[in-house]
């Protein structure tokens, strides 16, 4: 439609111009030519143009799938490797993601061309002449040097440390709509100065499972991932033992539906109150998730479960 309009404008300008070489005519010709170059003239090009338009959204969804499987399917293996002294940093995970994407491409790729038959002599051995034998030796030497180089690069990659912290967003872990009880637990209005908290490690110990399995079993449970400043504050207040890895805070009252009733009092005994600055950060984090969840509520609840 855009090309049709431009052609009509060009036709009018050509009719009003004596020699058809005015600046406006030349400008319209240039615009029409540029628009035609951007147009797809076959099905693959047209679909690829649509792909480029939606590529950012597609890539974001793929990234969410990778994160979900990292936090659920792969997390026990990652934790086990780290306990055994292995380094599982961002470069290792990125390599794993690339392998996953490469494997996912195979069903959509063309079948490989058939290999030519291998020539053999009468004794069943490969029939190669001396020149081919010499070339194979050279390729073998080059392969050896490449292998050594690859090992050195791999060693350099393993020596790198550090992985950027990523926010924990429970709404990404499952595709099914959350229940009303799950939504209400993220309401920031239920969190005040009298709210008692407990670490996820303590709850997991009572339930006899690691925290990763706890979050896999209850992917939408309310939790707050402490950053380094939060952990330092809790450590200075003797509320947290300094340890490597992430620290999650849960609302102690939420444990009533998780642990057996006989152990709930033990949970309350090790729970604690937190200071206002940290409480404000927790409420802010809860509010962002609650805004995404509350669309599933039929009506605004007046009390909290």
Curated annotation (Swiss-Prot):
Annotated tissue distribution: Ubiquitously expressed.
Species in which this protein is naturally found = Caenorhabditis elegans
- InterPro entries this protein is in? DNTTIP1_dimer, TdIF1, TdIF1_C
Q: Where in the cell is it found?
A: Nucleus
Under what name is this protein listed?
Suppressor of activated egl-4 protein 2
* UniProt function note: As a likely component of a histone deacetylase complex, together with saeg-1 and hda-2, functions downstream of the cAMP-dependent kinase egl-4 to regulate the expression of genes required for egg-laying and foraging.
Q: Per the record, GO CC terms?
A: nucleus
Keyword terms:
DNA-binding, Nucleus
DNA-binding region spans which residues?
158-170
Which parts of the sequence are annotated with region: Disordered?
138-168
PANTHER family recorded for this chain?
DEOXYNUCLEOTIDYLTRANSFERASE TERMINAL-INTERACTING PROTEIN 1
Main location group: nucleus
Please give the subunit comment from the record. Interacts with phosphorylated egl-4. May interact with itself. May be a component of a histone deacetylase complex containing saeg-2, saeg-1 and hda-2.
Q: What GO molecular functions are on record for this protein?
A: DNA binding; nucleosome binding
| Organism superkingdom | Eukaryota
């Amino acid at each position: 439609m855009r090309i049709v309009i431009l052609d009509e404008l060009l036709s009018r300008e050509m009719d009003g111009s004596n020699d058809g070489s005015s600046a406006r005519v030349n400008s319209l010709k240039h615009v029409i030519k540029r628009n035609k170059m951007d147009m797809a003239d076959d099905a693959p090009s047209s679909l690829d143009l649509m792909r480029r338009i939606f590529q950012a959204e597609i890539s974001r969804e793929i990234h969410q799938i990778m994160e979900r499987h990292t936090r659920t399917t792969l997390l026990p293996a990652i934790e086990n490797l780290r306990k055994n002294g292995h380094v599982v940093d961002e470069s290792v995970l990125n390599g794993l993601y690339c392998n996953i994407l490469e494997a996912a491409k195979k069903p959509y790729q063309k079948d490989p061309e058939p290999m030519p038959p291998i020539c053999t002599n009468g004794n069943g051995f490969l029939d190669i002449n001396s020149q081919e034998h010499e070339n194979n030796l050279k390729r073998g030497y080059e392969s050896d040097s490449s292998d050594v180089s690859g090992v050195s690069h791999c060693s350099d990659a393993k020596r790198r440390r550090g992985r950027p912290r990523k926010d924990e967003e429970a709404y990404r872990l499952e595709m099914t709509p959350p229940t009303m009880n799950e939504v209400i637990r993220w309401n920031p209005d239920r969190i005040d100065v009298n709210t008692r908290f407990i670490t996820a490690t303590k709850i997991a110990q009572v339930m006899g499972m690691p925290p990763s399995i706890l979050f896999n079993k209850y992917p939408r449970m309310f939790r707050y991932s402490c950053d380094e400043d939060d952990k330092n504050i809790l450590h200075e207040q003797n509320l947290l033992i300094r340890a490597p890895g992430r620290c999650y805070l849960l609302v102690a009252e939420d444990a009533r539906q998780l642990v057996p009733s006989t152990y709930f009092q033990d949970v309350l005994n090790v729970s604690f109150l937190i200071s206002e600055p940290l409480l404000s950060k927790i409420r802010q984090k809860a509010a962002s998730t609650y805004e995404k969840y509350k669309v599933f509520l039929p009506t605004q609840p007046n009390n909290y479960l």
